[in-house]
Amino acid sequence: MEYFIVPYLLWFLYVVFMVLYLGIKDQEEGNKLIAFLIIGMTVFLVISAIFPNGLRLRPTTFARDNIFVDMVKKLYSVDTSTNVLPSIHVYNSLGVMIAVARTKLLKNHKIMKNGLLLLGGSIICSTVLLKQHSMLDVMVAFILGALAYVVCYREELATRTSLSSAEIE
């Protein structure tokens, strides 16, 4: 499981790269991604201020000794397991995955698109497998993501709903 440190650490580049890429190449989608991220991180800060939280899931001993275990140990030493609900790694990864799925820039680049979606899924899995977050942290991030999706993409949802209603009639 220690190998999941790689996608976990790639999260930083994943989010920054996609914000910059979409901000330059697809401003409409980039702005929606930024709004999505701002909503989630603001809610996270409010929750953490009102309801400080934490976990005690991390192991104290490891079955193997390799560079990836060393990286996990270093992560544990610099990143406390406090204020983990909801998981910002999960929430921001969801936001990037939504933007990747929606942008027209990747329409003809299936390998890149699927690779970015796979990386996002791996990042989400890594949060639990590295014992950085519980399933509750992940579920709350998904719920928050669904709510933020409605806020950030409501125009498309309204258009899609009205089109579906027109097709029924």
Range-by-range predicted roles:
Residues 41-49, 118-128:
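Aromatic-anchored segments of alpha-helical transmembrane domains
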Residues 58-62, 80-85, 122-149:
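Interfacial helix-loop-helix junctions of multi-pass membrane proteins
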Residues 140-169:
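C-terminal membrane module of polytopic membrane proteins
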Residues 7-14, 88-95, 139-143:
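Membrane-embedded alpha-helical segments of multi-pass membrane proteins
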